[in-house]
């Protein structure tokens, strides 16, 4: 099974507002960069889309180390999702889970691979996380100008 390192980030100008996501995928010496965005979104949605898009870009099952600066993504997929599923995608206080469709997509993308999640401190000089942040801002830029783009 191939081993891939993935670094993801999301960005939003206003929350909600125009947003973008970015991901760096590394397999040995080969790197691939992905980014995209939406006109009206939240930072959490962009963080989720970064992870979903990166995992979905892998053509075959892989052993993945996924690095995110989002405790929301890390805790959601590794802790909270079990209760949400048991409760019919409701929170402990019976409210609908926010971004349920993205959590379901992330779970499906994750389940194709052997994924280990890692939390990294954002904006702390971690080179790949900084690059993912640059890609997220690049993905957001067209939406700040009213255009759509995905790379």
From Swiss-Prot:
Q: Which residues bind Mg(2+) 2?
A: 9, 133
Query: How is the cofactor bound, in the record's words?
Result: Binds 1 Mg(2+) ion per subunit. May bind a second metal ion at a regulatory site, or after substrate binding.
Indicate where this protein resides in the cell: Cytoplasm
Question: Which residues hold Mg(2+) 1?
Answer: 9, 47, 69
What the entry lists under SUPFAM superfamilies is as follows:
Ribonuclease H-like
Report the record's Gene Ontology biological process terms: DNA replication, removal of RNA primer
InterPro entries named in the record: RNase_H, RNaseH-like_sf, RNaseH_domain, RNaseH_sf, RNaseHI
Q: Which HAMAP family match?
A: RNase_H
Q: How does it assemble?
A: Monomer.
Name this protein carries in UniProt: Ribonuclease H
* Source organism of the structure: Rhizobium johnstonii (strain DSM 114642 / LMG 32736 / 3841) (Rhizobium leguminosarum bv. viciae)
Query: What is the organism lineage in this UniProt record?
Result: Bacteria, Pseudomonadati, Pseudomonadota, Alphaproteobacteria, Hyphomicrobiales
């Amino acid at each position: 099974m191939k081993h891939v390192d993935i670094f993801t980030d999301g960005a939003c100008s206003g929350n909600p507002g125009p947003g973008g996501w970015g991901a760096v995928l590394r397999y040995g010496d080969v790197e691939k960069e992905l980014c995209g965005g939406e006109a009206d979104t939240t930072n959490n949605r962009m963080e989720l889309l970064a992870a979903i898009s990166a995992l979905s870009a892998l053509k075959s099952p892989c052993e993945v180390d996924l690095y995110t600066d989002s405790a929301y993504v890390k805790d959601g997929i590794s802790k909270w999702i079990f209760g949400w599923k048991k409760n019919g995608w409701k929170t402990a206080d019976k409210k609908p889970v926010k971004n349920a469709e993205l959590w379901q997509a992330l779970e499906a993308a994750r389940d194709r691979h052997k994924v280990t999640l890692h939390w990294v401190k954002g904006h702390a000089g971690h080179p790949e996380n900084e690059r993912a942040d640059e890609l997220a801002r690049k993905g957001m830029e067209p939406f700040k100008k009213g255009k759509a783009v995905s790379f």
